[in-house]
Every structure is written in C-alpha cells, then in structure tokens.
Amino acid sequence: MDATTINSLFLVGALLVAASILVSSLSSRLGIPILVIILAVGMVAGVDGGGIIFDNYATAYLVGNLALAVILLDGGLRTRVASFRVALWPALSLATVGVLITTVLTGMVAAWLFNLSVIQGLLIGAIVGSTDAAAVFSLLGGKGLNERVTASLEIESGSNDPMAVFLTVTLIGMLASGQTGLHWGLLGHLIQEFGIGSFIGLGGGWILLQLVNRINLAAGLYPILVIAGGLAIFALTNAIHGSGFLAVYLCGLVLGNRPIRSRHGILHMLDGMAWLAQIGMFLVLGLLVTPHDLLPIAIPALGLALWMILVARPLSVMVGLLPFKAFHGREKAFIAWVGLRGAVPIILAVFPLMAGLPNAQLYFNLAFFIVLVSLLLQGTSLPWVAKLLKVTVPPDPAPISRAALEVHVTSEWELFVYRLGAEKWCIGAALRELKMPEGTRIAALFRGQQLLHPSGSTTLEVGDLLCVIGHEHDLPALGKLFSQAPQRGLDLRFFGDFVLEGDARLGEVAALYGLKLDGIDPGMPLSQFIVQKNRGEPVVGDQIEWNGTIWTVAVMDGNKIQKVGVKFPEGTRPGPGLFL
C-alpha cells in the first residue's frame, strides 16, 4: 500500500464520518434513529452507490468488536448501581431465558421460511437473539422513561451478549462438525462465559480504579488510561474464554459508581469516543452489505423480522419477567417492543462467514435486514409507544451546564449553573428565602455581564445566572427549586391533584379525604402501604388504585418513597387542597 492509497483512505474515511455527523441532524426532524442514518450513509457510499467496494469481513469484525467495547465501557460508566435494586434479576432473566426463547422461536420459523435444517434455523435465531447495547443506549437517552424500564433494558443489553455469542459459536461448531445433539457440557461453557466475564470485569475495574486514583498524570491522560484499561480487560477476558462484552461493561460500572479522579474529563472524552465508535461501526457495516442482495430475500426476511418483533420477543419477555410481580403490563409491553437489534447481530453474522459455512451469506443478509427493520420500526416509534403505554415520567429540570471541582483526588463536588427565566418560581424571591438542599451553596450570581456579590437580601431577577456548588445527588432538589411553572403544571397533571409526604399516616389521610380503611392499620405510613400494594421495589411513576383514587410515587430518596401524588376522579376532587 503506497502513500497515495493511504492518503485516499484518510480522505474517504474523514468525508464519510463528517457526512454521517452532518446528516445526523435529520434524525430529530424526520424522527428516524441516528443509527439508521449512519447505516444509510455507508450503504449509499458502498458498492451499489458510491462504488466503494468493501468485503473484508475480518476488518469489519475487528472494528465492530473495538467499537462495542468502547460503547459498553461508556454505558457502564453511566449506569448507576442504585438502578440494580429494581432491575438486576429481571434483566439477567431477559438476558438468558429471554435470549434462549427468542432464539428458538425465531430459529424454527427461519428454518421453515428458508427451507433450512433446524440447526441452521436456530443459528439464525441465535445471531439475531440479543438486543444491542449501542442501539439501546443511543435511543433510550433523554426519553424520560421510568427507572424500572430504563434500567431493565440497559442492563439486559449490556449482559445478553454472552448468551447470544455462546449459542452462535456452539451452533456453528455443531454445523461444522455435523453434530446434531446437545450435551450438558455446553451449560458449563455458558456458566464459564458469565463467571470469567464477571470476575475479570469487576476485579479489573477495581484495579483500574486504584491506578487512576493513585497515579499522578496530566489530566488528559486519565481518559486514555481508562479506555486502554477497558480494552485490555475486554481482550484478556476473551483470551481466557470469558465474555469480554460483559467484562468491559462491568469494568465501566465499577469506575462509574466509585469516586474517581477526573470523572468529568473521563466521561466527556468517552462520550465523544462512544459516538465515534458508533459512527465508525455502522459506516463499516453499511459498506459491508450489498443492497441488491437483500431484494431476493426481502419478503420472507420481512416476515421473519415481524415474527421476531411481534411474537418471539413479546413471548420471551412475558416468560422472562413472569416471576417479577413489580412489572406492570404496560411496562412489559414496552420492554417487549424495545427489543432493539443493532450492530451485535451483524457482527455475529460474520462468524459463519469466517468459518466458511454453507449459506453464510444468507445468514449475514438476514441479520442485516432484521436490524434495519428493527431500527426503523421499533426505533422510530419508541417515543410514541412510550407515551401510549404511559411509561414516561416528568423529567427533573437540569442545569444548563455543570463542571467538576477537583478540590481533592476523588472530589465529587460540582458547580451547577442555572439560568432563571420569567417562568421560574423563584423570580422575585430573596436568596435567604430559598430552601436550598443541605450541603449546597450559592457560589456566584451573574446579572447580564456583571458578577454580583450575593447576600441574603439579594432578589432574583429574570435572566440571572445562578452558580450553585453541590453533589450529583442534589440535582433533583435543585431542579425542583429552580423549575419552570409549565414543568410544575406537568408534574401536577402526571402525579395528581395533591402531593403528600410518604410518611403521612393512612388514618390521617383517610380522615382528610373521607376514605375507607377497610381493616388497614391506620398507623401505617403511606409509603409502606404503596410498597405492599406494588409488590416490588418502587420507582417514580408507579401507580396503585385505592378507594377509587390513583396514588403515584412522586419522589424517591434511595429506596424510600418520599412523596406521593393523589389523583381523584373527575368531579370528586375534595377541598380545601393540600400540597406538602
């Protein structure tokens, strides 16, 4: 390869990445997932469009694995361990039992539609059996879903790859050797994948955390150290026959949930790296496919995709979540719909090609077609389905910017900046009248281009910039304090006519609103009553019905219900109102 060829590769690669970024602005206007647009750019530039011929499956496999490792590391860093209280076991059930059921149901229909053997059909089912972390993390961000749904989908997508990889590799081995039966040794191999991946991921994450916090480096080197360490953990786990995908996700989880030096710098750089990984991966996969090869299989492939989306995935979710009573029917329905397929199935479809199996090109084309249908149908409709099934909750108002305060090595202090508009509740209030969360301080107040010296008598005006020092866990309280009037109205429409304290006694609540206790202990706190009726760990947005009224969890403090909204049937709202 001469210098001219290398320079041409740089030019084409840079133009494709730039084009993907520029056309991504169409995503919000057209309501099409950004990953589909990037995939389309690759297809348009490929053999049937711009004429770029790319058929190197080994390179695609390399790029795909590298990109997924970075995306999973970033996803783990942003996942809060607190969400595990409501979603760990349900997500693991979906990642194992769910993938197995989807594989079998999809595989049997694939064998019938394409006149394949049962083992060949099951291989297709295994290839498309897992949800994709890149697609899930990308499309769920900022949708305002309740914690139980979001955590279940994110943990599932981060942990279901071992099952899909295990099934795919096992079935490829069976086809290559002519084997037709299963044996118990395969179960041991699956346990090995999960066990080694978990051990190396958690242990390696802890070691990497100690390195970051104990070694003095230039600030810009810490993100690079984290990425290099994450990739080393990914590769080492794969080398000893564990799940590298699970390991790198757990590594990120450890780093993201412990005090770590240069936290914001690491997250900021990884955000950009994760975007670059997604763009590069979907561009390569778009270049790899030959669009005219998809046309002959379009009708049966569409039938298989719809079967998986409308039948196999919903059945696997219903069975996988059967033991978990906290999930409402609408939450199960949404989780069933958001079985997003992305890069993982396409990368798994490269395995048969590299193994030289018969019909390997068919497996690849089918996987690509199913991913395309999934992203277009499920990804595009996700916001509408979320509203239809009522799994969204009003988001907490966020600061316009936030920055870390590195006062010591593992400092978790941050500076939050809020801009006060005319609709803010605090306009006209003196600073001493603000009920600031404990441990927070107002550091500065800007009015126009002037820095004021704030005192207790300083009143807030429209357009003021307020700088507050606090911790991440103070954001919900600060958000409520500096919320907008329309946002508060949205809260009241969602949570109900009144909001009560979670420790209010049922007897007092019943007496105030004329409700019947029917043998319920009048001394029981309202929060405890809702937990009992909910039959599981509560999250914001959970609802129960009692005495013809709707009771909604409005504010959580860790595992404890802090505030509860109550909504009365039309025309029966009591008075006077109560707002606590």
Curated annotation (Swiss-Prot):
Per its UniProt record, what Pfam families does this chain match? Answer: CorC_HlyC (PF03471), Na_H_Exchanger (PF00999), TrkA_C (PF02080)
Kindly provide the name given to this protein in its UniProt entry: K(+)/H(+) antiporter NhaP2
Mind telling me which InterPro entries this protein's record contains?
A: Cation/H_exchanger_TM, FAD-bd_PCMH-like_sf, FAD-bd_PCMH_sub2, Na+/solute_symporter_sf, NhaP2, RCK_C, RCK_C_sf, Transptr-assoc_dom
Domain called RCK C-terminal: residue spans: 402-484
Function description: K(+)/H(+) antiporter that extrudes potassium in exchange for external protons and maintains the internal concentration of potassium under toxic levels.
According to Swiss-Prot or TrEMBL, what is its membrane topology?
Multi-pass membrane protein
Organism placement in taxonomy? Bacteria, Pseudomonadati, Pseudomonadota, Gammaproteobacteria, Pseudomonadales
* A GO term, aspect molecular function: potassium:proton antiporter activity
Q: Which keywords does UniProt give here? A: Antiport, Cell inner membrane, Cell membrane, Ion transport, Membrane, Potassium, Potassium transport, Transmembrane, Transmembrane helix, Transport
The record's HAMAP family line, in alphabetical order, gives: NhaP2 (MF_01075)
SMART domains, sorted? CorC_HlyC (SM01091)
Which catalytic reaction applies to this protein? K(+)(in) + H(+)(out) = K(+)(out) + H(+)(in)
Indicate the transmembrane segments per the record.
6-26, 34-54, 57-77, 86-106, 108-128, 162-182, 189-209, 217-237, 240-260, 279-299, 302-322, 334-354, 366-386
Q: Does the record bear Cell inner membrane in its keywords?
A: yes
